[in-house]
Amino acid sequence: MHDSVTVHMAAPPERVWELVSDVTRIGRYSPETFEAVWIEPATGPAVGAQFRGHVKRNEKGPIYWTTCTVTACEPGQTFEFGVGNKPGAPLNVWRYDIVAAGDGSDVTESFTLTPTFGLRLYWAVLGWSRGKTNHNGMRTTLERVRDDAEGREATTQ
């Protein structure tokens, strides 16, 4: 229960990291998470910082808030967060890895689901559909980040 997408961006790793680690920008990039806010006292990315993401599942609904905790934060390299209210026991983990490559950066977005019984059952029945949605959503997110990082207007739907 893991997938990833990599997109090359003609921008330095520091610029890309600045964009993906600023969760308040997520509404510009993600097809599902349309806003996010830092939970006080957090005001920016740091391990242990928490934020709330406002999600519209499958771009149709249901609409809900989820709590996220930053679990890895290396400027210019990595931004990772766990989703779920239990610190240390996330439902899933989303991660951005940024590597300098040629004229810019190769950026990989990935997710890993915690293999609970309920999630295993869900993925056995509907996982093919949700997996495709996640894969396409990661590609869309990275393409929109690329547009911003390269100085073009990010295209939103």
Positions of PLM-derived features:
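Short, cysteine-centered beta-strand-loop-beta hairpins and adjacent loop/turn segments enriched
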Residues: 57-64, 115-118
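Beta-strand/loop substructures that line and gate deep hydrophobic ligand-binding cavities in soluble
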Residues: 82-140, 145-147, 156
